[in-house]
């Protein structure tokens, strides 16, 4: 999927609410859900469990615009929360938020890390630290990216990649509260530190030997 793509979800308005009604829907293979939005009344809906679960497993359901077809009427929304049964993993409830396609929105976009095994610092024995696996951005609904890439290839020990280092499209802005947070870093491990310490005396001895040889030759 690319910018501007939508995920279609068919739904129907449900007249009844409450625990008993929700239980009956689930028994019939449906998911109780709600769509809410600013200056709009919430709409209680139901949707196919099998269809929605498949979309959850194969599509970026949280970071892509949803085209809700409610009894044939199209509405655009974002998936805000998915509740699942703690044992079976079945989806028990979904919250959607209405979206105005003419206004910018905030959305959490997943980060995809490239070259983790080829990372310069990791190859030298450093430990890779991933501090953020998603990024809160502000953009138009039609410009939501499926994901954002972070290349770790040249990341050395003791160095970090900040949000400001990412090549973000001009159509979006970072909306995180923390100013320029670290996305990933490589820290020295105990083995790396020990290797440095083991090498230090040898270098010192070599330097002392060279100095003594130079003094003898005078």
From Swiss-Prot:
Function: This is one of the proteins that binds to the 5S RNA in the ribosome where it forms part of the central protuberance.
Keyword Membrane: no
Subunit structure: Part of the 50S ribosomal subunit; part of the 5S rRNA/L5/L18/L25 subcomplex. Contacts the 5S rRNA. Binds to the 5S rRNA independently of L5 and L18.
GO biological process per UniProt: translation
Organism: Anaplasma marginale (strain Florida)
CDD domains in the cross-refs: Ribosomal_L25_TL5_CTC
Family the entry assigns: Belongs to the bacterial ribosomal protein bL25 family. CTC subfamily.
Protein name: Large ribosomal subunit protein bL25
């Amino acid at each position: 999927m690319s910018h501007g793509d939508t995920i279609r979800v068919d739904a129907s308005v449900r007249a009844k609410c409450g625990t008993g009604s929700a239980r009956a829907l689930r028994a019939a293979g449906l998911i109780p859900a709600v769509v809410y939005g600013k200056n709009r009344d919430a709409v209680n809906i139901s949707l196919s469990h099998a269809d929605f679960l498949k979309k959850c497993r194969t599509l970026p359901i949280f970071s892509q615009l949803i085209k809700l077809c409610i009894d044939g009427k199209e509405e655009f929304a974002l998936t805000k929360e998915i509740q699942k049964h703690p044992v079976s993993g079945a989806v028990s409830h979904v919250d959607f938020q209405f979206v105005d396609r003419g206004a910018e929105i905030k959305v959490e976009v997943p980060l995809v890390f490239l070259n983790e095994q080829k990372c310069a610092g990791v190859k030298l024995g450093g430990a890779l630290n991933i501090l953020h696996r998603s990024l809160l951005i502000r953009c138009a609904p039609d410009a939501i990216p499926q994901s954002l890439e972070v290349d770790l290839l040249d990341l050395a020990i003791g160095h970090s990649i900040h949000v400001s280092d990412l090549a973000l499209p001009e159509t979006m802005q970072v909306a995180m509260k923390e100013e320029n947070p670290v996305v990933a870093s490589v820290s020295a491990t105990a083995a790396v530190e020990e290797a440095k310490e083991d090498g230090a005396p040898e270098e010192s001895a070599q330097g002392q030997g060279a100095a003594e040889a130079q003094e003898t030759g005078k």
